[in-house]
Each structure stands twice: as C-alpha cells, then as structure tokens.
Amino acid sequence: MARLQEFYKETVAPDLLKQFGYKSVMEVPRITKITLNMGVGEAVGDKKILEHAVGDMVKIAGQKPVVTKARKSIAGFKIRDGYPIGCMVTLRGAKMFEFLDRLVTVAMPRIRDFRGIGGKGFDGRGNYNLGVKEQIIFPEIEYDKIDALRGMNISITTTAKSDQEARALLVAFKFPFKN
C-alpha cells in the first residue's frame, strides 16, 4: 500500500469525518483518479516530438499514455481530423497515490518562484485542475535529455460534492495552497 494511501485511511478520513459531520466513512471524499494531459500541437509537423512527449509521460506517470487525436479539422492550425495532437494517462489506485506523493513532496517544491498553488482550479463539483509549465520539475526527467520544455494539465477527480470539501481533502494531503 502506498504511503499516502495509508495516511488517508489512518489520518485524513477520520479528520474529515469529524470536520464535516458525515454519518458514514463512505461519505468522506476521496481521490478517485488523476489524469495527466499533455497537448503537443507541434506534433502535426514532426512525429518525433510526440514520441518524446510520450516518453516523458511514461517516465512521469509510470505507465504508457494513450495518444489523443484531433476530433475535427481546423485549417487555421493546419490540423486534420484524426491527427495525433497529444497524449494522456489516467492513474488510479496505488500508482495514483505514488504520483500524488511525488507531486506534492518532490515536484512542487522544484517549481521556480513557487509560492503555492492557486485556489481557482476547482470546477464547482469537487475536482481540481492544475497546470504545470515545465515537465522538468519531476525528478524522473533529466534536463540534458529533453528536446523541449512542455507543460501539462493535472486533473484530480474526487468524490467530494463541493469545492469546500475537495479543498479540505487536498489540504489534508498537504497541498501547498497560497492562502
């Protein structure tokens, strides 16, 4: 069992149970999945760029991503229907908790001029979205071996019914919010 998974069962769940006055442990919000998405628009011109992005995502997530394709043609971006334009990976279970642990304890402190993450990434239904500008904040990525700096979107899906519950859950997991 991952370190954060044990921490959730032993500390976070009982604390949230008391804080929000739930009747059952099953009502306590929990993280169901984490989705990493990397849009690589430059892949239209060069297929190797997408291969590098997929390689970076494998190192970061620990599992092979699925290549996302364009849903419709857009002439302004020189994109045709079905062109590969990005990659995404969905983490659940132990891999999800291990990634979350690395994100909070190792990767976030490595962000340049980091003062905490903003609280505006909540969607109103208890999910949180976070943008990362550079993939080199993860220790698995070696700076000398990357071809370009790429950002990604990290989407944390929870069972929380409101943003307040989701924020309390993420704060309990030691997410460094600004205020």
Curated annotation (Swiss-Prot):
Entry's Gene Ontology BP terms: translation
Gene Ontology cellular component terms for the protein in this record: ribonucleoprotein complex; ribosome
InterPro entries the record matches: Ribosomal_uL5, Ribosomal_uL5_bac-type, Ribosomal_uL5_C, Ribosomal_uL5_CS, Ribosomal_uL5_dom_sf, Ribosomal_uL5_N
Pfam families: Ribosomal_L5 (PF00281), Ribosomal_L5_C (PF00673)
Keyword Ribosomal protein assigned: yes
Keyword list, A-Z: Ribonucleoprotein, Ribosomal protein, RNA-binding, rRNA-binding, tRNA-binding
GO MF: rRNA binding; structural constituent of ribosome; tRNA binding
Keyword hit for Ribosomal protein: yes
Quaternary structure note: Part of the 50S ribosomal subunit; part of the 5S rRNA/L5/L18/L25 subcomplex. Contacts the 5S rRNA and the P site tRNA. Forms a bridge to the 30S subunit in the 70S ribosome.
NCBIfam families listed in its UniProt record: PRK00010.1
PANTHER family hit by this protein: 60S RIBOSOMAL PROTEIN L11-RELATED
Functional description taken from the UniProt entry: This is one of the proteins that bind and probably mediate the attachment of the 5S RNA into the large ribosomal subunit, where it forms part of the central protuberance. In the 70S ribosome it contacts protein S13 of the 30S subunit (bridge B1b), connecting the 2 subunits; this bridge is implicated in subunit movement. Contacts the P site tRNA; the 5S rRNA and some of its associated proteins might help stabilize positioning of ribosome-bound tRNAs.
Family note: Belongs to the universal ribosomal protein uL5 family.
Name recorded for this polypeptide: Large ribosomal subunit protein uL5
